Amino acid sequence: MSTTNVTASEIDKFSQHASQWWDELGPLKTLHQVNPVRLAWIDGHIDLQSQKIADIGCGGGILTEALANAGAQATGVDMAADSIEVARMHAIENNLVIDYQITTAEQLAAAAPASFDAITCMEMLEHVPDPASVIKSCAALVKPGGYVFFSTLN
């Protein structure tokens, strides 16, 4: 598995917080606070019901679960295995069917081009050495006429 667009220190940083992804008052609380705004922004552009959506850089699945709860067929992608494990367990606890994968946007785009109605990539681009590669891969993942949603630090 190629991980050329991954920084080990970034993976380690998020792996250290893996057990705290779902602590709404913990170190990742800002993600919980902005999640309703994110979801409303996405929902304002597409009807989430039955849409096939990939959440690139999903971490512990905060946005991914919100998308699934809104009716989307959600896939969460991240390279932090500990975060993906937390996301999988939380989805099971909440009776949600979400396809979580330990892979990169680039690898998913090579394996499944033009296979999603929408892509989300929130606060992830600042954590990779080559953001343009992720953007290109997200564009390759979305079906013609689909949507790609990005958010990153200014």
Indicate where each model-derived feature is located.
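Conserved SAM-binding loop and adjacent beta-strand
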Residues: 23-42
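Soluble or luminal CAZymes and related metallo-dependent hydrolases
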Residues: 6, 34-38, 130
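A short secondary-structure junction motif
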Residues: 21-24, 49
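Conserved short-loop catalytic and cofactor-binding motifs
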Residues: 2, 26-30, 122
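N-terminal, positively charged/glycine-rich alpha-helical extensions of SAM-dependent methyltransferases
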Residues: 1-22
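Conserved SAM-binding loop
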Residues: 39-46, 51-153
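Conserved acidic
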Residues: 7-8, 27-30, 59, 79
